[in-house]
Amino acid sequence: MARQYPLEKFRNFGIMAHIDAGKTTTSERILFHSGKTHKIGETHDGASVMDWMAQEKERGITITSAATSVTWKDCQLNLIDTPGHVDFTVEVERSLRVLDGAVAVLDAQMGVEPQTETVWRQASRYEVPRIVFVNKMDKTGANFQRSVDSIHSRLGVKSVPIQLPIGAENDFVGIIDLVEMKAYFFDGGENENYETKEIPAEYLEEAKKAHNHMLDEIVTFDEAVMEKYLDGQEISKAEIKSCIRKGVVSSTLFPVLCGTAFKNKGVKPLLDAVVDYLPSPIDVPPAKGYKVGEEVQIPTSDDAPFVGLAFKVATDPFVGRLTFVRVYSGILTSGSYVINTTKDKKERVSRIVKMHAQQRDEINEIRAGDICAIVGLKDTTTGDTIASENQNLTLESMTFAQPVISLAVEPKTKADQEKMGISLSKLAEEDPTFRTYTDEETGQTIIAGMGELHLDILVDRLRREFKVDVNVGAPQVSYRETLKAKADVEGKYIKQSGGRGQYGHVVITFEPNHDKGFEFEDKIVGGKIPKEYIKSVKAGLEAAMNNGPLAGYPMIDIKASLFDGSYHDVDSNEMAYKIAASMALKEAGKRCKPALLEPIMAIEVTVPEQYFGDTMGDISSRRGMIEGTESRDNVQVIKAKVPLSEMFGYATDLRSFTQGRGNYIMQFSHYAEAPKSVVEKVIEDKAKKNKTA
């Protein structure tokens, strides 16, 4: 089957923003105006196409990233709408990893908000080119220039308006296109019809000034155009667009557009900008792959061998396990086999589907540069590389934040007990920031995630999708443990009980590995431990790390280097080395200065000025570190870092001392060593809990 659209006509892009900036409404208008849907779905009445989960429709928020494909101006646009709530940043992270561009949506009243900063940093980490859409220009308090200024002040990047609003709030009627130097007046109807007119006289001077500012900023991306500009020659519209595109593709220029998606003003010009300025798969640098000891470039070509990255796993009620894949090179056909090079496992591609939110269109093949979902991959999880059988390389995987909050779940009946384990495993497959494990001391099943809303949604899904009824305990802080000192530690397991025995012997260097997770290094030389047992040593360490030496919390940020040991020709086996490794880690827990780590949250509190002092004092009383304050429209905004353990009940307290006029948002920042008083209390509480279990 021939390619329907050439690679240069592809746009893989996402919509990203702070919660309530209007991402999903913008996505719904894109679907409607591109002809993908014939009725506009609204988030506020639960009719959104992209927010298809029951929980999304009820709460009016996006929880899972939804993918769809639309066409606009002879281009195929693969669009992913991502969540804005901090608890679901994993969805943003894995979407940005595979996208070539993004539209950052801002609320025209609020400008850049805290979650905007978070998703912007995520996009910068993957060097994703972006354009900015200042939405809700019809909202009371909307201010385009202030929103543009907030991009400079809070994101620290070069943003250049390529449109200006005509009016604001209830008087927002259209936009000025600074490239074409024309005005578009919208009729407000759902088809977003607009009249193109000359720029009104009262806006002409401002438009000329903004046009010249735009030229000053963009000509630097093309030497020939810059020479023309400096010589006083006129720059053509095609040259202007070319310069903007070069700046965007290089991730150093961020054009700003405006409109109101809900009132159908500005979405069609936004779609034009996606086509004109965001890159195609061949405009961005080729993906990097890793073979043993070398880095290789993966050409974006149908003629190259197939290589793809699994960026999401979802459970579909009709077809079962769906694996979302970005294809970087080659062609994949349904019924073929691939190798999961991350896990070294062969997988069969039963079916390939293109997704439209939760709907599926089956296709026979998928080609380089495209995004699809695959049915039939049993062992492939988020971050895994799949490739044709002769490709022994892996793509860079993804790293995800550790869970910060946990709670116990208990099945209500024996039938629920049997279903719960399988259901939790499926949810954990879908969501890399969700963990489930059994507390060895109490026997309770613990689920852990990124926030109370995150766990609330997962418990709701357990009940609705998987029909598992559970009792839920109170939320608890997910502490972590680590080692602060370096030591060489021996683990030796010998068991002789008639017949064949057990023998495993390892010597491991344990040391701190700050912010780098668990790292295992095989330094065995001379065959002191046979190669087939090395993986068992690593597996034994990983299992033992689930139960730290201080209070039984999972261990993180440790490097383990296996450098010595021995084996027995008859008695050595995988289990013996797993046990020996766990014994070594247990001993390291005594000798390497174990420490308890607590999750630290970044909070931003907004209060009227008269409550500023009380709020500052309250944050300090919670062991908070104030990082900065600023005034915004008669309110004070306080940024601080506070331990999560001190934030339970904060919403109620804040409402109380601000008479309901204060609000805050909170997101995970990092893990930090807990003070001695906290360590003692955590150990004491854990001991009491284990006693009563």
From Swiss-Prot:
Keyword Nucleotide-binding listed: yes
Protein name, as recorded: Elongation factor G
Say what the protein does.
Catalyzes the GTP-dependent ribosomal translocation step during translation elongation. During this step, the ribosome changes from the pre-translocational (PRE) to the post-translocational (POST) state as the newly formed A-site-bound peptidyl-tRNA and P-site-bound deacylated tRNA move to the P and E sites, respectively. Catalyzes the coordinated movement of the two tRNA molecules, the mRNA and conformational changes in the ribosome.
Q: Which NCBIfam families match?
A: EF-G, PRK12740.1-3, PRK12740.1-5, PRK13351.1-1, small_GTP
Query: What cystine linkages occur within this chain?
Result: none
What family is reported?
A: Belongs to the TRAFAC class translation factor GTPase superfamily. Classic translation factor GTPase family. EF-G/EF-2 subfamily.
Q: Has UniProt tagged this entry with the keyword Transcription regulation?
A: no
Q: Where is the tr-type G domain?
A: 8-282
One GO biological process from the UniProt record? ribosome disassembly
Q: Where in the cell is it found?
A: Cytoplasm
Q: MF terms per GO, please?
A: GTP binding; GTPase activity; translation elongation factor activity
Sorted alphabetically, the keyword list is: Cytoplasm, Elongation factor, GTP-binding, Nucleotide-binding, Protein biosynthesis
Q: Which residues bind GTP?
A: 17-24, 81-85, 135-138
Q: State the GO CC annotations.
A: cytoplasm
